[in-house]
UniProtKB/Swiss-Prot annotation:
Topology term for the membrane: Single-pass membrane protein
Transmembrane segments: 9-25
Family: Belongs to the cytochrome P450 family.
Domain of life: Eukaryota
Annotated compartments: Membrane
EC code(s) of this entry: 1.-.-.-
Single GO molecular function: monooxygenase activity
Protein's name in the database: Cytochrome P450 monooxygenase 128
Organism: Postia placenta (strain ATCC 44394 / Madison 698-R) (Brown rot fungus)
Cellular component GO terms, alphabetical: membrane
The protein's annotated pathway: Secondary metabolite biosynthesis
Length: 547
């Protein structure tokens, strides 16, 4: 019988670790020859080490994917590191299958890790039973009735931004170059502060002091914006053992999380105290002792409702986790989409004029949600913006078991055989190509890459099976994990466009080809000739009417 001495243990442990590493590396190196995806059509790898990674990291929009999809069909194989095959499909039946089986297809651990750096452990990151509980409790706060109540905030803050730009443009003779993204980001931050927590960021106030919560989120966004261009962060996200190695990113994000935690706990304590005071004083109506329409108050109310069993309620930590989720999802995505909307309108002055004519027919400056939703061309412009410029361009899922994914469009393998399913192994990642589906010529026609709001007057039959929660688009995903706040975002965006396009004319300030985009959590605009200035969207803003 063999026995180990104290001297042998380190050697045995090292040998075991080496054998385990050799096994894992061997499996990875064999995947190009053993993966069930190897028979799928797709582009050749540019190199054995990088596969198609370098090509994809260098692309600014969906042009390269579109080229490949036209050549290889809606379901294809891409090559990751070491030529490992990766599934890529815009097949509507396949996406519907994966999105509707969210338990079997959760987010990969590395994606959840990256999102936690920005969003915390909130609804977007939660999986399984916790996600279902959070969703059930939070759903009422994002219903139509609640968004109707919040529309007043959307309009008031839109008008505040309008007045700031109006004064700025007036000082400069009625026309000025303005970085619209900066103002829109401040406006949507103010909105989510009030609508989300009844918290004043005062981001639009030019005399306001720097806000530490806003500064904390800028640090978190820095992490994600660097994720696509830093090989160290990519490798670190894939190998959890490397995350224990401290670096500048991890130190800054840890400090930022401390700030959000402290302020979040303070907000929750204030809401609970106010609700308790209301209950003790017997107040029944909202807005007497507390502006109870904000999302956090509604969440706390719902969580303490007698209709929710004790074992189904969220802990304070679970409620706290929603604070960064509300902030990021509630302001960065909407400001980004509105930025790209005005960019599109600056290129299509005919569309801008037609839209302004419709908006000018509304007899009030403070429209309700129902009045905004009753404007058909505004609705078409918003839909077309969300199609071409979705704030989040892709998602990802991972198979928790071996499976066969059904296809609407069969593919031919390398041996000439047709298949109407794709067989995948446990651990296979499944990208959700939001932008790819939204811009597919096979679904939307040859003009799929053009900004044409009129297309919404007669939507192609081919887009009907797209499994999105809203408007035959993948922008807000679909299934049990569809974006809970899509109504909030759409009405806020309509309020912004309504207010700004009635007051201003927008034109390009730089050549169209000088505008590029970089993808982090959202796709942010940059000016190629002014990259040192960071993200921006400069437009020429002109006064249209005297207010």
């Amino acid at each position: 019988m063999l026995s180990l001495t104290a001297h042998d243990i380190p050697w045995a442990a090292g040998a075991t670790l080496l054998a385990w590493a050799a096994y894992k590396i061997g499996r990875i190196l064999l995947l190009p020859y053993t993966s069930p995806l190897r028979g799928l059509p797709g582009p050749p790898a540019s190199s054995w080490l990088f596969g198609n990674v370098n090509e994809l990291m260098g692309t600014e929009d969906f042009a390269l994917y579109s080229e490949w999809l036209e050549k290889y069909g809606p379901t294809m194989k891409l090559n990751s590191w070491f030529k490992i095959p990766k599934l890529f499909t815009i097949d509507t039946r396949a996406m519907n299958y994966v999105l509707s089986h969210s338990q079997e297809y959760p987010k990969p651990e590395r994606s959840r890790h990256n999102l936690v750096q920005i969003l915390g452990n909130g609804l977007v990151v939660a999986e399984g039973e916790l996600h279902r509980r959070e969703r059930r409790i939070m759903n009422p706060a994002f219903g139509p009735a609640q968004i109707r109540e919040l529309t007043e905030i959307f309009v008031e803050k839109s008008q505040q931004l309008r007045d700031i730009w109006w004064n700025d443009v007036a000082i400069r003779g009625g026309s000025a170059r303005i970085d619209i993204q900066s103002g829109l980001t401040k406006m949507t931050l103010d909105v989510i502060g009030l609508a989300g927590f009844n918290y004043e960021f005062n981001a639009l106030n030019p005399d306001g002091k720097p806000n530490e919560l806003n500064a904390a989120f800028e640090v978190m966004f820095e992490y994600l914006s660097n994720l696509r261009k830093s090989y160290w962060l990519i490798i670190r996200s894939r190998f959890p053992i490397l995350r224990c190695i401290p670096d500048g990113y991890s130190r800054r994000t840890a400090a930022a999380h401390k700030v959000t935690r402290r302020i979040g706990l303070q907000l929750i304590a204030e809401k609970k105290a106010a609700l308790k005071q209301m209950a003790q004083s017997g107040e029944k109506t909202a807005g007497t002792a507390l502006k109870s329409r904000d999302l956090l108050t509604l969440l706390i109310k719902a969580n303490t409702s007698p209709d929710i069993p004790e074992d189904q309620r969220l802990s304070d930590e679970d409620v706290l986790a929603q604070v960064p989720t509300f902030l990021v999802a509630g302001h960065e995505t909407t400001s980004n989409a509105t930025t790209w909307c005005l960019y599109a309108l600056a290129q299509r002055l005919d569309v801008q004029r037609k839209l302004r004519e419709e908006l000018r027919e509304v007899p009030v400056d403070n429209p309700s949600m129902d009045q905004l939703n009753a404007l058909p061309y505004l609705d078409a412009v918003i839909r077309e913006t969300m199609r071409l410029y979705p704030p989040v361009v892709a998602g990802i899922r991972i198979a928790s078991k071996d499976d066969e994914i059904p296809l609407a469009v069969p593919y031919m393998d390398a041996h000439g055989r047709m298949h109407d399913t794709v067989r995948i192994d446990k651990g296979t990642t499944f990208p959700i190509p939001i932008l790819g589906v939204n811009m597919s010529k096979a679904l939307w026609g040859e003009d799929a890459r053009e900004f044409k709001p009129e297309r919404w007057e007669s939507v192609p039959e081919a887009v009907q099976p797209i499994p999105g929660v809203w408007s035959n688009l993948m922008t807000f995903i679909g299934g049990p994990r569809a974006c809970i706040g899509y109504r909030f975002s759409l009405v806020e965006m309509k309020a912004l466009i309504f207010t700004l396009v009635r007051a201003f004319e927008f034109e390009m300030a730089v050549p169209i080809e000088d505008i590029t985009r970089k993808i982090g959590l959202v796709q942010r605009p940059f000016v190629r000739s002014e990259m040192e200035k960071g993200t921006q969207m400069p437009l020429i803003v002109k006064q249209h009417v005297r207010l």
